[in-house]
From Swiss-Prot:
<dbReference type="GO" id="GO:0005737">
    <property type="term" value="C:cytoplasm"/>
</dbReference>
<dbReference type="InterPro" id="IPR013159">
    <property type="entry name" value="DnaA_C"/>
</dbReference>
<keyword id="KW-0547">Nucleotide-binding</keyword>
<dbReference type="InterPro" id="IPR003593">
    <property type="entry name" value="AAA+_ATPase"/>
</dbReference>
<dbReference type="InterPro" id="IPR027417">
    <property type="entry name" value="P-loop_NTPase"/>
</dbReference>
<protein>
    <recommendedName>
        <fullName>Chromosomal replication initiator protein DnaA</fullName>
    </recommendedName>
</protein>
<comment type="function">
    <text>Plays an essential role in the initiation and regulation of chromosomal replication. ATP-DnaA binds to the origin of replication (oriC) to initiate formation of the DNA replication initiation complex once per cell cycle. Binds the DnaA box (a 9 base pair repeat at the origin) and separates the double-stranded (ds)DNA. Forms a right-handed helical filament on oriC DNA; dsDNA binds to the exterior of the filament while single-stranded (ss)DNA is stabiized in the filament's interior.</text>
</comment>
<dbReference type="Pfam" id="PF08299">
    <property type="entry name" value="Bac_DnaA_C"/>
</dbReference>
<keyword id="KW-0067">ATP-binding</keyword>
<keyword id="KW-0963">Cytoplasm</keyword>
<feature type="binding site">
    <location>
        <position position="147"/>
    </location>
    <ligand>
        <name>ATP</name>
    </ligand>
</feature>
<keyword id="KW-0235">DNA replication</keyword>
<feature type="binding site">
    <location>
        <position position="148"/>
    </location>
    <ligand>
        <name>ATP</name>
    </ligand>
</feature>
<feature type="region of interest" description="Domain II">
    <location>
        <begin position="69"/>
        <end position="99"/>
    </location>
</feature>
<dbReference type="GO" id="GO:0008289">
    <property type="term" value="F:lipid binding"/>
</dbReference>
<feature type="region of interest" description="Domain IV, binds dsDNA">
    <location>
        <begin position="315"/>
        <end position="436"/>
    </location>
</feature>
<keyword id="KW-0238">DNA-binding</keyword>
Amino acid sequence: MLADEILELLQTKISANEFDCYIKQLKFNEKASNEDFIVFNATSELMAKFIKTRYAEKIAYLYEVKTGKKPEVEITSQTKLKNIKQNQVNVKQIKAQSSILNPGYTFENFVCGDSNQFAFLNAKAVADKPGVLYNPLFIYGTTGLGKTHLLQSVGNYCLDQGKVVICVTSDQFMIDFTTHLNSHSMTKFREKYRNCDVLLIDDVQFLGKTDKIQEEFFNTFNELIAKKGQIVMTSDRPAKILKGFDERLKSRFEQSIMADITPPELDTKIAIIIKKCEFDKIYLNKEVIDYIATNMGDNIREIEGAIINLNAYASLMRVEITLEFAKNTLKDLIKEKHENINLETIIEIVSKELNIKPSDIKSKSRVQNIVEARRIIIYLAKMLTTNSMPQIANYFGMKDHSAVSHNIKKINELMESNEIFNLRVTEIKNKILTKG
């Protein structure tokens, strides 16, 4: 059976202990599965949640390697199996209609901070008055910062107000388009997407693949806006640097309200962890919360995954989650920091590579090439050293860590929009790592 082959393949990619503790117990649920939706049963709800967080994506990838098609993978417990059978809709039908809105994504449980406040306020305003304010809305930022949460919060809020909501990823939109085109039923496709009150498109950057799909989306976009239908899109980059898009469609995107989400500051990460713990009824002491916030990087999904891992391990081993336990459990997940690399090393190498005096870096000079070099150093310091953002701010005599966030954001934007600059920064980073 293919499912057995997949688990055997997974066994070669993880430790024997991991396989015996978690994967060996999984039972393939043939009745609840199809080629697009794969279900495995675990021995308990807690175990199912942990395995899904840690291994579902790996299992889906192995299916793709074997079959050329990536399914959705669900790990469930026997107690929840009934609900899956009652609620499961064939994934082909889901992809041909809209993604199911996750009721857990609401404005109430979204943690707002300096890094996402503008996007949050715009999304809330759009939900309050769809088609009236800020239409269309374009939310952008790197992976794992909360774009999908905000998008679906708009959808759930509008759904509660009795609005017709279509929420799809760009991949689902493309599959839906192709299905209707091949079955000569484009009228139904257009009725669906052009007669809704709110259209939500997640990861719109992937629409830049096919001219026909772009043409269809362009016409859908125009008709919805003309009818005062609300459009909200998310992307991993600003509209102006999207690749592969027709200029007319790109121009429409650029006319949107642009709301970016940047990596969360420390206070926001702490608030996110506290909120997650409250929601899942998990107790973490302040030491552990601070440790996760400081060391887990900026990806909110990874932070939430770390909390689930901690709770699962602690429950299985029946121990309290102490700082030492957290450090030991999360050591493989914690983003590697290069303790032998410090700010002085980075300044020395960046100054040499960019032909700037090290003394100019810490000066108040606003000369463009010095400002850019300073920003690169701040960006690399956050990435490669153990220094916190407040420590970096203090080193450069900045008012607070928000100035550090601003400089990092500027470098990220440049790296996304300028391939030569991106390569230059990467080269410098590699030289620092080699020396460190």
